[in-house]
Amino acid sequence: MSFKKSAEISWFAPICDGDDDFLGNRNPLYKSSWENTCKIVQTADKLGFKNVLCPSSFQVGQDSLSFVAAMTNQTKDINFLPAIRCGEIHPPMLARTIATIDHMVKGRLTLNIISSNLPGENLESKKRYERSKEVIQILKLFWSKDFVEYEGEYYSFKLPSDPAKPYQINGGPLLYLS
């Protein structure tokens, strides 16, 4: 019996500037910009890469969700993996934004959930992961219910959610946690 081995290769969209500091002298050609990053992602798409990670930074660089939305008509096959820092965007708005983008890319969307501190915060790890857990619960509720009533430690609201449903009918985009 033989097993076929396969590997899924992803690419990195340098939408956050400054990640190349550790490479030595910074090359101005690699500075984060819409034009440069768009070309990189289009090339990765043409070369058959499966995914592209779109990182998030609250200090410098482009916004990952805005970048992915803008790239929808610039690519054909590549799956987008934007990093989402929990707590940065109000969860009902985040659910609606993600559902909209998921329709724009026709399901070529996976989410990288980040549980880091926000600017000026110094929450212990446990609290950050609890907040992320609430955000994930809220996203799932907004993607599956027409009205959401939620009471948690970090968020509390009663809001309609229709029609903020993702393109992917299996409960929304796949989530990676980091």
Task: For each feature predicted by the language model, list its residue ranges.
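Flexible, glycine-rich active-site loops centered on histidine and acidic residues
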Residues: S2-K31, H90-Y155
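Short beta-strand and adjacent tight-turn residues that come in two discontinuous sequence segments
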Residues: C54, A83, L111-I114
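Short hydrophobic "strand-cap" motifs at the C-terminus of beta-strands
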Residues: P55, R85, S178
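Glycine-/small-residue-rich active-site loops that bind phosphorylated ligands and cofactors
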Residues: Q59-V60, C86-H90
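A short, GP-enriched loop/loop-strand-helix hinge that lies immediately N-terminal to
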Residues: N79-R85
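Generic, ordered loop/turn and secondary-structure boundary motif
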Residues: R85, E149-E151, Y155-K158, Q168-N170
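Extended catalytic-interface subdomain
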Residues: R131-F142, F157-P166, L174-S178
